[in-house]
Structure formats: C-alpha cells, structure tokens
Regions:
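A broad, low-specificity signal marking well-ordered, structured residues that form hydrophobic/aromatic
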Residues: 53-54, 79, 125
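A short linear-motif detector with a strong N-terminal bias
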Residues: 33-35, 57-60, 105-108
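A conserved mid-domain beta-alpha-beta active-site/ligand-binding segment of alpha/beta enzyme cores
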Residues: 65-109
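A residue-identity detector for tryptophan
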Residues: 27, 59-63, 73, 115
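Active-site beta-strand->loop->alpha-helix modules in alpha/beta enzyme cores, enriched
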Residues: 1-52, 87, 91-95, 109-111, ...
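C-terminal and late-domain segments of enzyme folds
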Residues: 100-129
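Short, flexible loop segments at boundaries between secondary-structure elements
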Residues: 48-70
Length: 129
C-alpha cells in the first residue's frame, strides 16, 4: 500500500511544490489506509514547503455524521465546481473500473455503489482547510 512508500511520495512532492502552491489530498484521518498514508505524507510536505494544504474527506462520508467530534468540521469549506471541472471529475472517476464495476473473479458488487458515486459527483467539494 501507500504506507510503504510515503517517503518516496513526500520526496517527489517536495521537489514539485512552492510555498505559493496548494496541495490537495485525502484527509489524513479518512478511514482508508491509503488515503490516510497519502494525507499524512502530504501534510508533512505542506508543512516543510510552507504551502497551503486542502484535505478532502472521501471515505469519511461513509462513517461520519455531521456531529462526529472526530471530524474537523470547523475547518470545512465548500468549493463550487465549474461545469468543466465537474466534467473532468466525472472522467477521472470513470477510470476507476475496480471501484465502479462488479468483480467478475469474485462475484462481488462494485466497491462504490450508485449513492457513493452520486456523492462524489456533486457540483462542489468539501475540503478541510
């Protein structure tokens, strides 16, 4: 998983970022090990570089409630997406066949049900700033 290569991820990102950049990543306490490892690596890089960090709750929506004290709702902001941005997001999501289609080798349903993909394709993003 990503946890095995966070040092490489941090090194690669650190070489690309400037203090004036914004680094967008999964929230570091999202509840998925790859999301969390990526989020922690990005948070450290943002701290070192001095750039802005925007964290996205992804799996958080599956387990948290609006009152959940584990989630930094006080840091949440909604960013509206332009139609072109939403179209690009739709294209990107369509690339994740392993998440969207049933697994023929196991017979298991898609990992992301229709209600989850609908949430991913809202015309705004919630970010923790």
């Amino acid at each position: 998983g990503v946890a095995d290569c966070t040092a490489q991820l941090a090194q690669a990102l650190g070489g690309l970022l400037q203090p004036s950049d914004a680094l967008v990543c999964p929230w570091r306490n999202d509840g998925h090990p790859d999301h969390e490892a990526t989020g922690h690596a990005c948070a450290e890089v943002a701290r070192q570089v001095g750039c802005r960090l925007l964290e996205l709750p992804i799996w958080t929506w599956h387990w948290a409630t609006p009152e959940d004290p584990q989630v930094p709702w006080h840091r949440a902001a909604a960013l509206a997406l332009a139609p072109e941005q939403l179209a690009l997001k739709r294209q990107a999501l369509a690339c994740f066949h392993s998440q969207l289609l049933p697994d023929p080798s196991t017979g298991k349903e898609a990992i992301l049900p229709a209600w989850a993909t609908a949430r991913l394709l809202r015309p705004f993003e919630v970010v923790f700033v």
